[in-house]
Amino acid sequence: KGVLPKNYARPDLDKTRLGELVDLFSSIKVGDKESRSKDMLGRVYEYFLARFAGAEGKGGGEFYTPKSIVKVLVEMIEPYKGRVYDPCCGSGGMFVQSETFVEEHQGRKGDISIYGQESNPTTWRLCNMNLAIRGIDGNIGPNHADTFHNDLHKTLKADYILANPPFNI
């Protein structure tokens, strides 16, 4: 609730097109039944994030770290349990991969707690959407905020800190 911007609820939005889009995604058959049901919407969302980042060029690094790099970073820190913090969380890829890591190692979704913040308002919404699509509870603040000027987690004692390498420099 409250993840989508208010303009997605506007009366003039073509609901027929939206329904067709949902039907299209529902009809996609990739792999076996278990693979199809497992995070299909999340994978589609991630695909589009990567495409948008590529189209943005250097600026795309503000919100998207390639999945291969995120996976290596998460596997290096091995966040089995505890608090995971990303001070400039972008679209939330570090959080998604951390949850995936826990599940792949027979952990439960609640074994880690997610904390982060993002200064760009659009990217902050992308992160909220990314977490919501995957059913991940996280605390990325009630609104966008710059970690340097408005730290939303001043008292947090994180067990793991992940951050995007500065690809956009």
Language model segments and positions:
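Non-catalytic, mostly N-terminal accessory regions of nucleic-acid modification and defense proteins
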Residues: 1-80, 139-152
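Conserved S-adenosyl-L-methionine
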Residues: 59-163, 168
